[in-house]
């Protein structure tokens, strides 16, 4: 397992190098510059700003300098947020995005598995059909549409939750539901199909023949094996939640990394765009690695196959 993790860490470093390189040159190829905008600066001032930030140097020199900075976990200064570096923006925005993302992931896992298990236990009954309708709705409706519907119903009409902002737990409820709706629907479908397959397996029939009650069979034997596809989906789910947070944070006025990223695109703040992209890439790669390790812990067959490959 340690050899496997070591190899994955090496692959992560190579992947990050490619991401940093591609992101850097894409930003350089973008039309305009960080100081181009509706209000054009005098040429002298723009030249001084370019010299101050090292943007007047040859492209390869800028690239090598940026690689060295990223290797030291320094993403440079922000062009638009005065007196703040990209690291400062990440430090202030990530706890907010992490809180929202963690709440959405936990909500998606809890409700998705619950609905999937209920649908499997009551296969081809009204409970199963109800869950099917809910999952179709969750998969079909984009998160930003869900956000607008939740704001209209629960904030503007019923007045149960605030429309936007980030001051207390009440402000997290609607955005976390909007962010969790699609992954929750996928998890419910995965759990249902996997649970039905497990419930029809031989060892479940043997457990029932031994006189074990239905709850005991479900909790002790069925759910653990049925959760394997859900664990596999956790990596893509993390990516889905992170990318979805860009729009959700903007809609709900949440001061997280997603909102900073969207604002940086509008403001041509290239260092923030590159820094947040690299930071999110690190988070996603770590999530995928953790999911792979968890999968090996849950399913010993995977652990054995990895050990054989590493030998």
Curated annotation (Swiss-Prot):
Main location per the UniProt record: membrane
Induction remark: Positively regulated by TnrA under nitrogen-limited conditions.
Compartments, record wording: Cell membrane; Membrane raft
Gene null: resulting phenotype: Inactivation of the gene results in a sporulation-defective phenotype. Disruption confers resistance to bialaphos.
GO BP terms in the entry: establishment of competence for transformation; protein transport; sporulation resulting in formation of a cellular spore
Transmembrane segments: 9-29, 100-120, 130-150, 168-188, 226-248, 278-298
Record's keyword terms, sorted: Cell membrane, Competence, Membrane, Peptide transport, Protein transport, Sporulation, Transmembrane, Transmembrane helix, Transport
Annotated GO MF terms: peptidoglycan peptide transmembrane transporter activity
Disulphide bridges: none
Residue ranges of every copy of the ABC transmembrane type-1 domain listed in the record: 94-295
A Pfam family the protein falls into: BPD_transp_1_N
Annotated membrane topology: Multi-pass membrane protein
CDD domains xrefs: TM_PBP2 (cd06261)
Any one of the GO CC terms: membrane raft
PROSITE patterns linked to this entry: ABC_TM1
InterPro entries, A to Z: BPD_transp_1_N, MetI-like, MetI-like_sf
Gene3D superfamilies: MetI-like (1.10.3720.10)
Family membership noted in the UniProt record: Belongs to the binding-protein-dependent transport system permease family. OppBC subfamily.
Function: Part of the ABC transporter complex OppABCDF involved in the uptake of oligopeptides. Probably responsible for the translocation of the substrate across the membrane. Required for sporulation and genetic competence.
Assembly description: The complex is composed of two ATP-binding proteins (OppD and OppF), two transmembrane proteins (OppB and OppC) and a solute-binding protein (OppA).
Protein name per UniProt: Oligopeptide transport system permease protein OppB
